[in-house]
Amino acid sequence: MAKQALQVAIDGPASAGKSTVAKLVAKRFGYIYVDTGAMYRAVTYWAMQQHVDLADEAAVITAMKSLKISFKPGEPDQLVFANQEDITAAIRQPDVTNNVSTIAALPQVRTILTEQQREMANAGGIVMDGRDIGTTVLPNAEVKIFLVASAAERAKRRYAENVKKGIDTPLAQLQAEIELRDHKDSTRKVSPLTQATDATLVDTTPMSIDEVVAAIAKIITKKQSSTI
């Protein structure tokens, strides 16, 4: 009998479309979606609210002790909570976006969140996206996808998202921020952004969201039929 409840890991750089695609893939297969990036953003937001030095790992860890991150169903997107506070919109603001790489580079923070993410994935039937899901968080995931797109294309996508949210940031600035974040994510000492050796590379630059979802769904369906 084919195994149905797979672990699906989707990795890639900032604004490659991971979250959007992961949500749609999860919905198609009736899987649970875990936004690991939102968890790092939640820690970043929480630490900033506590006026913590984001480079001070001990202080960030202390702040995390009073933080419980949770996800709840929402329409169209799931909601993210810090304790009882809805921070769904707050964690997507530029100040959080531009500081999350600092938090993500802290080894103990990654260890704590990685354990939480693994617990969520234990039962299978889960889609998780981030920077190091296939390499570190879920190294044994049955399906691993690495999404990429050009920095210019990713900047255009981020710009369009920001316009809808009423955020006015010049396109050139967004591309510069994305390129800087790529550098930070790929050169950090702990769990740098890298493609797992057994991951399937999908370049989304010329593709629509529906085309990307269809391509990944095909990979999952094939794996479901071959995993006993």
UniProtKB/Swiss-Prot annotation:
CDD domains: CMPK (cd02020). ATP binds at residues 12-20. InterPro entries: Cytidylate_kin, Cytidylate_kinase_dom, P-loop_NTPase. It catalyses: CMP + ATP = CDP + ADP; dCMP + ATP = dCDP + ADP. It holds the Pfam family Cytidylate_kin. It is an enzyme of class 2 (transferase). One of its GO terms (molecular function) is CMP kinase activity. NCBIfam families: cmk. Belongs to the cytidylate kinase family. Type 1 subfamily. This is Cytidylate kinase. The lineage of its organism: Bacteria, Bacillati, Bacillota, Bacilli, Lactobacillales.
